[in-house]
Swiss-Prot record:
Keywords: Nucleus, Sporulation, Transcription, Transcription regulation. The keyword Transcription applies. This is Sexual development regulator velC. It comes from Penicillium rubens (strain ATCC 28089 / DSM 1075 / NRRL 1951 / Wisconsin 54-1255) (Penicillium chrysogenum). Residues 1-13, 92-121 have a biased composition (Basic and acidic residues). The keyword Transcription applies. Disruption phenotype: Leads to a marked reduction in penicillin biosynthesis. Belongs to the velvet family. VelC subfamily. The lineage of its organism: Eukaryota, Fungi, Dikarya, Ascomycota, Pezizomycotina. Residues 1-124, 142-165 are annotated as: Disordered. One of its GO terms (biological process) is sporulation resulting in formation of a cellular spore. InterPro entries: Velvet (IPR021740), Velvet_dom (IPR037525), Velvet_dom_sf (IPR038491). It is found in: Nucleus. Velvet-domain-containing protein that acts as a positive regulator of sexual development. Residues 28-257 form the Velvet domain.
């Protein structure tokens, strides 16, 4: 048999190229949600019990929703950011405040032992006032892209020591990055002390769709901040670029201050 003729009769199968690895699996919708406190509260002046004496926390907390593996070119992801059924609520996360309230309840029970009803025994004044839940405020482009956080990634990078959503996305300054905010412009606190707020993301639609109780989709804690008595309050700060931009984009409830003219700012 001529040399090489056997290969024509019994050709060897061509080696197959290795199949490409499957694309990374996108996490479930619920696990994609994250909360990022874009603007931290720093200080506040303790306010009175009446609505006319409200003193908003300065600066007002601004919370942003982030999505794992968010793609700004994906209409599905953009629609998810624009879901009007999202809401973020807050509560006092300071355990010392809870202990103080328990002590106050014990004192009230002691006052009730004489059998005389008092108006201040039947009603407790909440320490926090303002809208307890905020609706989403969506913008097509982040008004302060230089401080915009990157959305988390499901692909871990060993060279990044911090979680992805804590890494600032400088590329956002070159892109029109959409964003959804929850802005607590009227949050006030009645008693002086050290506070820390817990923010929780929920979706009213989960109740409508499933008939079950509304789950907490994500949560975030603020940095500790101090609420001062009126005589010790250091004054209001100038508004941030983010706050000014959000007001220009239509969130009119924000009261902005600038050029060193913050209301209540003490003169040196």
């Amino acid at each position: 048999m001529p040399h090489g003729f056997d290969k024509l009769l019994h050709p060897e199968p061509e080696p197959q190229s290795p199949s490409p690895p499957p694309p990374p699996r996108r996490p479930s919708t619920q696990s994609r949600y994250h909360l990022h406190i874009r603007q931290q509260p720093i200080a506040a002046r303790a306010c009175g019990a009446g609505d006319r004496d409200r003193r908003p926390v300065d600066p007002p907390p601004i919370v942003q929703i982030l999505l794992t593996d968010f793609d700004s070119n994906s209409q599905e992801d953009r629609d998810l950011l624009q879901d009007p059924r999202f809401t973020v609520g807050y509560r006092d996360g300071n355990r010392d405040r809870e202990r103080e309230r328990e002590h106050e309840r014990e004192r009230e029970r002691e006052r009730e032992t004489d059998g005389v009803a008092r108006t201040d025994d039947n009603f407790s004044t909440p320490l926090l006032s303002g809208k307890a839940f905020m609706s989403p405020f969506y913008v097509d482009a982040d008004p302060d892209p230089n401080s915009a956080p990157a959305h988390p990634s499901s692909i871990s990078d060993p060279h990044i020591s911090n979680p992805p959503h804590h890494v600032y996305n400088h590329a956002a300054s070159r892109l029109h990055q959409p964003a959804t905010f929850f802005i607590f412009a009227d949050l006030s606190i009645r008693s002086a002390g050290l506070y820390r707020l817990q923010f929780r993301l929920m979706n009213w639609g989960s109740v409508e769709d499933t008939g079950q109780s509304m789950p907490i989709l994500a949560q975030a804690w603020s940095d500790p901040f101090r609420v001062y008595p009126a005589k010790d309050f250091p004054g209001m700060r100038d508004s941030s670029i983010l706050a000014e931009g959000l007001k220009e984009l239509g969130f009119v409830e924000l009261k902005t201050r600038g050029h060193g003219k913050g209301k209540g700012k003490k003169r040196r």
